[in-house]
Amino acid sequence: MGNVLAASSPPAGPPPPPTPSLVGLPPPPPSPPGFTLPPLGGGLGTGSSTGRGSERTPGAAASGAAAASEDGSCGCLPNPGTFEECHRKCKELFPVQMEGVKLTVNKGLSNRFQVTHTVALGTIGESNYHFGVTYVGTKQLSPTEAFPVLVGDMDNSGSLNAQVIHQLSPGLRSKMAIQTQQSKFVNWQVDGEYRGSDFTAAVTLGNPDVLVGSGILVAHYLQSITPCLALGGELVYHRRPGEEGTVMSLAGKYTLNNWLATVTLGQAGMHATYYHKASDQLQVGVEFEASTRMQDTSASFGYQLDLPKANFLFKGSVNSNWIVGATLEKKLPPLPLTLSLCAFLNHRKNKFLCGFGLTIG
């Protein structure tokens, strides 16, 4: 839901995905160990004291369907999660590209406050330094959730990304995000999300300007129809001088046993994903994207291999453009170190990128 801020400027760079969601603020720095940084659209968690329905997961869907069949009632439907999270389960399996050398140092100053230092050196992109701050408040909703959450990140040029997330009531969560480019104020947005027992509704307002008459409004709604099926939609309205438009898309999510299938269909194209948990160690995903604007389609396959006893995590992917990628993360106990290796090969363009990362803390 937070992908609306860049719609006020013409698109640049590679073609956007076929979903009507627009590009938003860069993601905040990762939360430190022991800290909780829930996204605005994140689930309230099964351990939450909110009393709302828990978000549907592949494992929970099977048990929910079995329980419904036993008592013959369909009245207790699970919360379907949020619209923007429909494809997240599959996308998390794909490796993230990293080029050059990256060093990250996490330092906890207290149980609720941490700072992060990140240095990135690259041969293609510019080298940079980022300073991040994470604060978790005292409003404890569950053993893993506390509010408010404040996150800030500033680079060596003075550009700032900041977010504030707060749980206003058991079902209502809000977020405010701002972005500056050096000394210039660039973007800001306000989000509100309400979670019912079997539905989720959310609204985002980005870059409103009453004097100029411009802004972006995004509305999401996702409703559980059965313990396994959820349907919903997204409406994006944008306005600026001399231009006004609306984009609408529909989504469906089906969760059963250990797999999850999701499809989003709209004016911009179609986006479909399939997630399958083969075992506790292996997860696989397939993604298909079709863009009506770019007249282009692509398909991707990704998998994740997790070996907790060996402190080993591997992700690999290949797509229809013949781009092969892989990342490897290896924790080095008893030291608080995590080693990361990344490699991507584009067979069509004959290009190869690799990266090395080290996280301390």
UniProtKB/Swiss-Prot annotation:
<comment type="function">
    <text>Channel-forming protein essential for import of protein precursors into mitochondria. Plays a role in the assembly of the mitochondrial membrane respiratory chain NADH dehydrogenase (Complex I) by forming a complex with BCAP31 and mediating the translocation of Complex I components from the cytosol to the mitochondria.</text>
</comment>
<feature type="compositionally biased region" description="Pro residues">
    <location>
        <begin position="11"/>
        <end position="36"/>
    </location>
</feature>
<dbReference type="GO" id="GO:0044233">
    <property type="term" value="C:mitochondria-associated endoplasmic reticulum membrane contact site"/>
</dbReference>
<feature type="region of interest" description="Disordered">
    <location>
        <begin position="1"/>
        <end position="73"/>
    </location>
</feature>
<dbReference type="GO" id="GO:0006811">
    <property type="term" value="P:monoatomic ion transport"/>
</dbReference>
<dbReference type="GO" id="GO:0005739">
    <property type="term" value="C:mitochondrion"/>
</dbReference>
<dbReference type="GO" id="GO:0015288">
    <property type="term" value="F:porin activity"/>
</dbReference>
<dbReference type="GO" id="GO:0046930">
    <property type="term" value="C:pore complex"/>
</dbReference>
<dbReference type="GO" id="GO:0006626">
    <property type="term" value="P:protein targeting to mitochondrion"/>
</dbReference>
<keyword id="KW-0406">Ion transport</keyword>
<dbReference type="GO" id="GO:0005742">
    <property type="term" value="C:mitochondrial outer membrane translocase complex"/>
</dbReference>
<dbReference type="GO" id="GO:0031966">
    <property type="term" value="C:mitochondrial membrane"/>
</dbReference>
<dbReference type="InterPro" id="IPR023614">
    <property type="entry name" value="Porin_dom_sf"/>
</dbReference>
<keyword id="KW-0496">Mitochondrion</keyword>
<keyword id="KW-0813">Transport</keyword>
<keyword id="KW-1134">Transmembrane beta strand</keyword>
<keyword id="KW-0472">Membrane</keyword>
<keyword id="KW-0653">Protein transport</keyword>
<keyword id="KW-0626">Porin</keyword>
<dbReference type="GO" id="GO:0005741">
    <property type="term" value="C:mitochondrial outer membrane"/>
</dbReference>
<dbReference type="GO" id="GO:0008320">
    <property type="term" value="F:protein transmembrane transporter activity"/>
</dbReference>
<keyword id="KW-0812">Transmembrane</keyword>
<dbReference type="InterPro" id="IPR037930">
    <property type="entry name" value="Tom40"/>
</dbReference>
<dbReference type="GO" id="GO:0005743">
    <property type="term" value="C:mitochondrial inner membrane"/>
</dbReference>
<comment type="similarity">
    <text>Belongs to the Tom40 family.</text>
</comment>
<dbReference type="GO" id="GO:0030150">
    <property type="term" value="P:protein import into mitochondrial matrix"/>
</dbReference>
<dbReference type="GO" id="GO:0005829">
    <property type="term" value="C:cytosol"/>
</dbReference>
<comment type="subunit">
    <text>Forms part of the preprotein translocase complex of the outer mitochondrial membrane (TOM complex) which consists of at least 7 different proteins (TOMM5, TOMM6, TOMM7, TOMM20, TOMM22, TOMM40 and TOMM70). Interacts with mitochondrial targeting sequences. Interacts with TIMM29; linking the TIM22 complex to the TOM complex. Forms a complex with BCAP31 (via C-terminus) which mediates the translocation of components of the mitochondrial membrane respiratory chain NADH dehydrogenase (Complex I) from the cytosol to the mitochondria.</text>
</comment>
<feature type="compositionally biased region" description="Low complexity">
    <location>
        <begin position="51"/>
        <end position="69"/>
    </location>
</feature>
<keyword id="KW-1000">Mitochondrion outer membrane</keyword>
<dbReference type="Pfam" id="PF01459">
    <property type="entry name" value="Porin_3"/>
</dbReference>
<protein>
    <recommendedName>
        <fullName>Mitochondrial import receptor subunit TOM40 homolog</fullName>
    </recommendedName>
</protein>
<feature type="compositionally biased region" description="Gly residues">
    <location>
        <begin position="40"/>
        <end position="50"/>
    </location>
</feature>
<dbReference type="InterPro" id="IPR027246">
    <property type="entry name" value="Porin_Euk/Tom40"/>
</dbReference>
